[in-house]
Amino acid sequence: MPRIVIVGAGLSGLCTAHYLVKSLSEAGKEAEILLLEAEGAPGGKMRTIRQDGFQMEWGPNGFLTNKPHGMELVKDLGIEGRLARSSDLARKRFILSDGTLHRLPETPPAFFRSKLLSLPGRLRIVWEPFASGPPPGVDESLGEFARRRLGTEALEKLIDPMVTGIFAGDPDMMSLRSCFPLIYDLERKYGGLVRGMLGVRRERAQQGMKGEMSAGPGGVLMSFDHGVQTLTDALAGRLSEGLHLCVSVDRIERRGEAYALSMSAGGRREEMAADVVVIAAPAYAAAGMVSPVDEGLSAALRAIPYSPITVAALGYEKATMGNPLDGFGFLIPGGEKRKILGALWDSSIFPNRAPEGKALLRVMVGGVRAPELAALPEAELLAMARNELAEILGISDKPVLAKAFFHERGIPQYLVGHGKRLERIDARLAALPGLYLNGNAYRGIALNDCVRESRSAAGRIARTL
């Protein structure tokens, strides 16, 4: 019986194992599936922490229904009854501009009426259908794209905070095609964003789809009553026999047609043979593992950078806050020169995030914009976050809860040239049959993307056995 070893039991590793079991069963095939995790618990960054009645997310806080993959997995696991739908308030998102919070418009007409942009800035967006086309043969940055089609003001006040909220990155460094392939395709298919939105609206109408198309990410934000860890716990529960914790793989070698994994488990050095290896660890960890197999592959993986980010969770008494937190939260353009990237108003987004009469916020610090701030000592960082909230939201009370979660290498950065790097990685893997890479460092950082890529990888592996 062939042995498949998956290294890393975060979302991507757990999903790969889940879909492998399913694909092999449907194909009438058998294999031994082992899942090795260096930490003492599965789930990776999808971790829910509870303290004093507050429920905090260590990393991501949910997934959108604008793509089907997350909901399909939830139904596959039979945990639909545990889902939590975001409040309608979650559609109200804010941008800080000139020291004032402005609601982010959701539709093109609302954009034109918004005071977030100046009149010249709004007129520049109106001119978008007449903007120049994409430069041929160039991996354009998101910043270059936004300046070309929407103007500098839209880049600074809309696109920059959006990239901060998703990647904690710099739009002038991020690849449009790799970060936002749908926008890239929209321009090439329809000749522009406004034409593209009108074209998609016509297609939706022809297909009988109702509802106005939003300029935002679309879909409904979903989580679970007891946090996002519900999903990874459900996946891990299906794989309990094959899941091994506190096993750190540091080296993979080619042995004939198979692979040998060197690892540390319980203080002992061990070696394990495998016919198929799926590395579902971060790119920087994968780089070290594959160095003995292919130094060129290792170098390509090491070249994928990550932005550091710290999440500061702050709980307050609602009665004395002086701010209703009526919305999803706010993001801050770099031009505002603030010390935080933004904040999510978690207890306004989902139920059960704070005890009765209290509110929970999560403040984002660091990113590419200010990596040194993410690494501040916890007490200093929490004090800074409190000061920023006092100046922006008027919340001056001492919090009843204050915790910081530091992610030294938090979010992979799809820089200009990312697509070419993936081509080099794929070419190297083609010469190493039985070795696969999976995770959020390659073709999408969102939960839906990770589920989609895991299912695809499992299908490819099942077909080769």
Q: How would you label these PLM feature ranges?
A:
Residues 1-12:
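Beta1/beta-strand and adjacent pyrophosphate-binding region of the FAD-binding site
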Residues 4-6, 33, 435:
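Conserved hydrophobic helix-helix packing surfaces used for dimerization/oligomerization
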Residues 12, 41, 284:
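Conserved Rossmann-like nucleotide-cofactor binding loop
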Residues 21-51:
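Glycine-rich FAD pyrophosphate-binding loop
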Residues 89-92, 124-252, 258, 273:
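Active-site/ligand-binding neighborhood in enzyme catalytic cores
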Residues 105-109, 324-327, 342-465:
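Conserved flavin/dinucleotide-binding core of flavoenzymes
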